[in-house]
Each structure stands twice: as structure tokens, then as C-alpha cells.
Amino acid sequence: MSQLDKVQAWVSDHKLDVAYISNFESIKYLTGFGSDPIERVLALFVFPDHEPFLFAPALEVEAIKDTGWNHPVYGYLDHEKPFQLIAKYIRERNANPIHWGIENNNLTFDRYEVLRSEFPNAKFEQNLTPVFEKFRMIKTADEIEKLNAAGAEADYAFEVGFNAVAAGKTEADVAAELEYALKKRGVMEMSFDTLIQVGAHAAEPHGATGMNQIQNNELVLFDLGTIHDGYISDASRTVALGTLNDKQKDIYKVCLEAQLTAQAYAKPGITAASLDKVARDIIDKAGYGEYFIHRLGHGMGMGEHEFPSIMEGNDLILQEGMCFSIEPGIYIPGVAGVRIEDCVHITKDGCLPFTHTSKELRYL
């Protein structure tokens, strides 16, 4: 049964007349067609007992057909009113759809209002956002194969990036060199902006690559990822240029112990919260707890941040096929930042990483 078939069965089981799917990641997951329509309307409509259809800007129609989509696709031109056309195509299948499912976390209020004006009797009673979060949380063998391929691309990027590090270069220089090497290799898209941070700049976990010059005797943090056939990689390594002082070495040692211990602990049957605690306890015991300022990990797949969330308070039981990051970090303002990250998938008795670049402290 395809993912689209599963959604159609869910729609039928929950007595809905129609499911309106508006999140472009959900659409890609169900149809194989990926596009961010920006201000235009891209939508998938699924019915319990009628064929689904895609509604898209006219300029996307041929690309949709090229994916192998074998159900109706309707295009619209920029001067047309998309929701009037959508209403027409829905009524061809159901003259008066009452029970609707929508993605609450994605559908904008203005589009919701237009939809209500077209279907004044509609009851938008099912939030599809958690439904798709649950569907996407367990990966298939095919999805894991794509994630492994993306991980191999990230490993290559690390090697290029490490070799590019030199005193006097900027963070941006290193990012540009590794991304250029990836493009020459046929990797056209990063999963997020490559992050290179040197020295104290790395103590800003959501900072950005900049023009900071790399100096000797500093730590350099890499956080990067690629997109392979719609699936992402995401990994972090921290390396040393020159000689480190005892504080820098200790921060790295503690962070590495937390990451390795958590990765060894990850398996089916434990809770997300307990996995976070394993890493956090190590960092707390070493005296750096106040500097570990984010959750241990986030789900990943087609999106950079999916479910599950590996954090305190999340009692979700880990299951085979779940994919997420394990990324403890220690960020001491004005001193240094260290983060070590692999994304993993849960197997029947443990977990396996998508990236394999060594996590032992590397001196360049």
C-alpha cells in the first residue's frame, strides 16, 4: 500500500468527505512531486471513494506529470481565482462536502477564509498535521537508503571542508570551497545554509557563517547537510587548528562522551526523554549543564526538522524506522562552542548513523 493509499484509507476510516493537503512537504511525501509554490496555490485533495487530484500553477503541470503522477492534475493561470476552480473540481466528486481535514499548522488564515466562503457548510474538524507527522516518523527501507546516500555526501563535504581550513581564511571561504566541490560532484542543493564557526563564534548555536578569520589554536565547528532525491543529511563535527588549551580539550571530551553514550543507548523501547537525559547527565556532571541549551535531537527525513523530538518531557517510545539527530553541544560565550552530531535510524536492536566521519578530535 502506497503512502497515498494509506491516507485515503485514513480519510475513509475517519468519515471525512475530503482532505485538503497544503504543506508542500506533505505533498512531496504523498505524490513524489516537490515544489515550494511561494505565493501560488499547490494542493492535493484526497477523497474516501474518489480519485485524488493535484491542483497546481500551470507552470508546474508538466513537471508533475514527469514524476509519474497518474491521477488528475489541474493547472491554473496567475489571473484566475484558484479557489473557485478548486471548488468546481471538488464538487465534481462531492456536491456538498461537509466533513473536512486540513493541515492546521500550514493553511493560512486568508486561504481558510476563502475556502469557507466557497463551502459555507463545511466543518473543518480534523487536523491533518499530526497525522502526517506520525506517518512520516517511521521511515521505509527506500527512505533510509536515500538518507544513507545523503549521509555519504555529507561525509565527503566534511573531508573537503577540513582540508580547506587554514589560518587567515574566513568561515565563508571554507563554506564556499566545500559547496563548490559538492556541486562539481553533482550535489546541487544543501539541506540548509552550511554553518562554519570558528572560536568563540561557535558558542552561538544558531549563528551564521560569516567573514570571521580562522586563527591557529582554535576550534572550528562544521554543521552541514545535503539533499539527495528529496531526503536530507544533517551532521556536525568540530575540529582543531593548531594546539588547544586544557579547557578546549575538556569541552570536546565531555561533548564527545555525551554523543557516543547517547548513540550507543538509542534503541527501540526507550523514551525520547530518557535518551536526552543520558547525554544531558554526562554534561551536567562535568559542570557544563548550563551551556547545553537545546534538546538532544530532532527528527529528519524529507525535512530538516521532523518528529520525533528528542527532549526532556517527551515520553514517546522510540520505534524501529524512526530517524533523528543526536547532537549534544556545549556553548560557552566568549570561549568556544562544540557540537558533535550524527543523524541515526533506529534498528530492531539499536541504531545506525547516516554519517561516518570520525568523531575523535581531529587536529588540522
Residue ranges of predicted features:
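Active-site neighborhoods and metal-handling regions in enzymes and metal-associated proteins
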Residues: M1-L364
